[in-house]
Design a protein with these regions (language model features):
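Switch/connector loops and helix/strand junctions flanking conserved nucleotide-binding motifs
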Residues: 26-29, 67-72, 131-134, 161-167, ...
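VWA/integrin I-like adhesion module and closely mimicked acidic/polar interface patches used
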Residues: 34, 128-169
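Acidic/polar low-complexity segments with low predicted structural confidence
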Residues: 1-15, 77-78
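Von Willebrand factor
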Residues: 9-72, 82-118, 121-125, 153-164, 180-191
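Surface-exposed acidic, glycine-flexible loop patches that form ligand/cofactor-binding
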Residues: 6-10, 47-53, 108-117, 143-144
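Von Willebrand factor A/integrin I-like adhesion domains
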Residues: 159-210, 218-220
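Short beta-strand-loop
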Residues: 55-86, 163-169
């Protein structure tokens, strides 16, 4: 008779990808929010099409107006339908600190991310500065508990993004990408896809992937 350990050994290990998106009012300018919506769908489709023995999972968070929301719970990409993916509308302020607390809660919850899961990848994209008190929640996320071990990537869009804060957020300097427009958003998400794909095909998915940023031109 098969033991519980045999069953667990056969079940694919989860690899969580957690995306936090800025949907504040400034994201409406120059088609940034539309590019973000397209890029998220393309990322999920690309990961869904990848043949892997890893249980790749995606969760979507966002912040804008006066709130931060969990828009899509952590779900295996194989089970995500296109009509389930949220379409973001840009408005209001940039309450980024609330999102840090929400992501922290998810990562520390072993009912959602079990101990056997691979280290999460956290992706943050923003074109502005937090309008709430983010310092405590970001410190908790990046320095304490299981979340401190996550791979953290970020994109700063335009000159108004808080570059210094994002430099502190990412787990390595190479994971901070600066962009200026909608085209750069799509290129960044390609980079995220390549980095995650590198991990799921690696013999050691918990080791930091070293993937060069794509330097080809991408037309939306």
């Amino acid at each position: 008779m098969a033991s519980l350990n045999d069953f667990l050994a056969q079940k694919p290990r989860p690899l969580p990808v957690i995306i936090a998106s800025d949907r504040s009012g400034s994201m409406q300018v120059d088609g940034k929010i539309d590019a973000l919506n397209i890029a998220i769908r393309e990322l999920i489709k690309s990961l869904k099409d990848d043949d892997t023995s890893v249980d790749l999972q995606v969760a979507l968070f966002s912040f804008g107006g006066e709130e931060a929301t969990i828009d899509f719970p952590l779900t295996s990409v194989s089970k995500i339908e296109d009509n389930q993916i949220p379409v973001y509308q840009a408005s209001g302020r940039t309450p980024m600190g609330l999102t840090f607390f929400q992501m922290k809660d998810i990562i520390e919850n072993k009912d959602i991310i079990p101990s056997r899961a691979y280290k999460p990848t956290i992706v943050l994209i923003t074109d502005g500065k937090p309008t709430d008190n983010y310092e405590v929640s970001m410190k908790c996320l990046i320095e304490e508990g299981r979340s401190s071990k996550a791979f953290r990537m970020a994109m700063a869009i335009g000159a108004d993004a808080n570059q210094k804060m994002l430099e502190s957020f990412v787990s390595t300097p190479e994971y901070l990408v600066s962009g200026e427009n909608a085209r750069d958003i799509k290129k960044f998400f390609r980079y995220v896809t390549m980095t995650v794909a590198s991990r799921i095909h690696s013999q050691t998915p918990d080791n930091p992937p070293t993937i060069p940023f794509p330097d080809d031109e991408i037309i939306l």
